[in-house]
Curated annotation (Swiss-Prot):
It holds the Pfam family Ank. Residues 369-487 are annotated as: Disordered. It comes from Homo sapiens. ANK repeats lie at residues 172-201, 205-234, 238-267, 271-300, 304-333. This is Putative POTE ankyrin domain family member M. Residues 377-392, 406-421 have a biased composition (Basic and acidic residues). Residues 476-487 have a biased composition (Polar residues).
Length: 508
């Protein structure tokens, strides 16, 4: 099974990679990304762990390690970039046959020797690569086997629950609820929930049964767990909540249910990604649109200060960029390196995105200029007109106030002059009249003096004052008041003439 130094095993020699991996567990453990071919593995910050017993085996299979696993440096001669996309065409056949082995041995590897990284080469989606549990029958007891395979009659399962602890954990800290939820055995999940098992127990990845159900897209089990009160906001060791996994899987119905049961739409994982940022980074346009409708924060930043727009530009998704621009998002925001979305688009040569950003910026400039220019001019015109109108009203009011008294004064003067002319006759009524006329005025049928119109002359000032106070100070009312004054004066003259005639008749 082991190839000689400098040679590579044939593809036919690797018939059962899982069996080989189980036999060579130590080699698989140390030849992964931490291996440098020197017998030392850099795990954590505490120091190097030496496994000198594996030096010979690793040196003999150095090339195989180097070509099958691009991240592993096996013999120390392979220096690949940070993206981990080094490819050796001679090993394509071997890697294709050992794709499952690569996928399960390396969380970041999908069997093609490539890892999905972010714009800066720092992001990997290893948390999303192995949704289902890897279960070995010998590691499970009866209850866990029944929960995983779900082929046990209900009666037997009830007996198992009576005899054993339903919250018991296996070596990977998984309970029966974890296994049943991850594998979609809704009958077992329902029975465990009816028995009031613990809901928020964490496995070795700090995931709850709800997180595993959502991650494995077992919606029926996930809804049952939500209805019984499972917390949807418990993060796993990667910082992802159940909503992150629903967004990654583009499961809008599950995301809607999680939000309905109180999931935090702004929770961040260890990379500082909210569900919206994760959806943009993974180019999940439908769930991005869904989260925007649910009022997700468009100004959220990851740990490098990148916005959703910058991530969309870096990922080269013109459709998501266009969708974000429709929300009037800020295109001038910078990340921690001081770069904007447009600068990323130019450096990445995304011409379509550059054009979208340029058009959006021009529209914003035109909009701002139109809003700032026209309203100010209108305000200036209206303010000037208002000031002129106020000045005109202030100037016209004193003139009207001064003109009305003059009219009244002129009328009063005319009345006084007429009264002076006829004052002797009017005031001499008691002296010139004979005694009989004065005594028998009402009995002899003499023409009595007309008293019906004298009150009008006496009430003239009152009517003039009332008219003055009720006047609305316009030209038409001025003319009416003048006509009334002249009419009243004529009436007064006629009254005095009639009185003179009456006095003359009485004298004769």
């Amino acid at each position: 099974m082991v190839a000689e130094a400098g040679s590579m095993p044939a593809a036919s020699s690797v018939k059962k990679p899982f069996g080989l991996r189980s036999k060579m567990g130590k080699w698989c453990r140390h030849c992964f990304p931490w291996c440098r071919g020197s017998g030392k593995s850099n795990v954590g910050t505490s120091g190097d762990h030496d496994d000198s017993a594996m030096k010979t085996l690793r040196s003999k299979m150095g090339k195989w390690c180097r070509h099958c696993f691009p991240w592993c440096r096996g013999s120390g001669k392979s220096n690949v970039g940070t993206s981990g996309d080094h490819d050796d065409s001679a090993m394509k056949t071997l890697r294709s046959k050992m794709g499952k082995w690569c996928c399960h041995c390396f969380p970041c590897c999908r069997g093609s020797g490539k890892s999905k990284v972010g714009p800066w080469g720092d992001y990997d989606d290893s948390a999303f690569m192995e949704p289902r549990y890897h279960v070995r029958r010998e590691d499970l007891d009866k209850l866990h086997r029944a929960a995983w395979w779900g082929k046990v009659p209900r009666k037997d399962l009830i007996v198992m629950l009576k005899d054993t602890d339903m919250n018991k954990k296996d070596k990977q800290k998984r309970t029966a609820l974890h296994l049943a939820s991850a594998n979609g055995n809704s009958e077992v999940v329902k029975l465990l929930l009816d028995r009031r098992c613990q809901l928020n127990i964490l496995d070795n990845k700090k995931r709850t049964a709800l997180t595993k159900a959502v991650q494995c897209q077992e919606d029926e089990c996930a809804l049952m767990l939500l209805e019984h009160g499972t917390d949807p906001n418990i993060p796993d060791e990667y910082g992802n909540t159940a909503l992150h996994y629903a967004i990654y899987n583009e499961d809008k119905l599950m995301a809607k249910a999680l939000l309905l049961y109180g999931a935090d739409i702004e929770s961040k994982n260890k990379h500082g990604l909210t569900p919206l940022l994760l959806g943009v980074h993974e180019q999940k346009q439908q769930v991005v649109k869904f989260l925007i409708k649910k009022k997700a924060n468009l100004n959220a930043l990851d740990r490098y200060g990148r916005t959703v727009l910058i991530l969309a530009v870096c990922c080269g998704s013109a459709s998501i960029v266009s969708l974000l621009l429709e929300q009037n998002i800020d295109v001038s925001s910078q990340d921690l390196s001081g770069q904007t979305a447009r600068e990323y688009a130019v450096s990445s040569r995304h011409n379509v995105i550059c054009q979208l950003l340029s058009d959006y910026k021009e529209k914003q400039i035109l909009k701002v200029s139109s809003e700032n220019s026209n309203p100010e001019q209108d305000l200036k015109l209206t303010s000037e007109e208002e000031s002129q109108r106020l000045k005109g009203s202030e100037n016209s009011q004193p003139e009207e106030m001064s003109q009305e008294p003059e009219i009244n004064k002129g009328g009063d003067r005319k009345v006084e002059e007429e009264m002076k002319k006829h004052g002797s006759t009017h005031m001499g009524f008691p002296e010139n009249l004979p005694n009989g006329a004065t005594a028998d005025n009402g009995d002899d049928g003499l023409i009595p003096p007309r008293k019906s119109r004298t009150p009008e002359s006496q009430q003239f000032p009152d009517t003039e004052n009332e008219q003055y106070h009720s006047d609305e100070q316009n030209d038409t009312q001025k003319q009416l008041s003048e006509e009334q004054n002249t009419g009243i004066l004529q009436d007064e003259i006629l009254i005095h003439e009639e009185k003179q005639i009456e006095v003359a008749e009485n004298e004769f």
